[in-house]
């Protein structure tokens, strides 16, 4: 993912967590906040509840790829944070992709509804 499309500063992550809306799924948590830009920015987090460093990095790679496959449908102007939950590495690829797609749809970012 290009650097200009990523959330990088802790200030941005804190702002999305503080001011944004959240949508939950057993595999991941989605936080969104308007960013008043012409493009979206994405951030992926995996805490220690996911497992050790290898498990956290694997979870982030899998979520990043699932988000990448769904992101063309996302409308512009949002900061999106996806937080991995415990069972994310045990889930199959289609289940994970469906979870991310469902979270984006629930948030109204899939292009079918304007938020």
Model-derived regions, located:
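Positively charged, solvent-exposed patches that mediate nucleic-acid binding
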Residues: 1-115
């Amino acid at each position: 993912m290009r650097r200009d499309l990523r959330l990088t500063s802790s200030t941005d992550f804190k702002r999305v967590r503080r001011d944004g809306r959240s949508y939950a799924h057993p595999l991941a948590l989605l936080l969104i906040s308007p960013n008043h830009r012409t493009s979206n920015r994405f951030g992926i987090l995996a805490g220690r509840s996911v497992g050790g460093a290898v498990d956290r990095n694997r979870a982030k790679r899998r979520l990043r790829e699932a988000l990448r496959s769904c992101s063309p449908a996302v409308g512009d102007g949002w900061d999106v944070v996806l937080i991995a939950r415990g069972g994310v590495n045990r889930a199959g690829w289609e289940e994970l992709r469906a979870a991310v797609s469902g979270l984006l749809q629930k948030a109204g970012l899939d292009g079918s509804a304007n938020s």
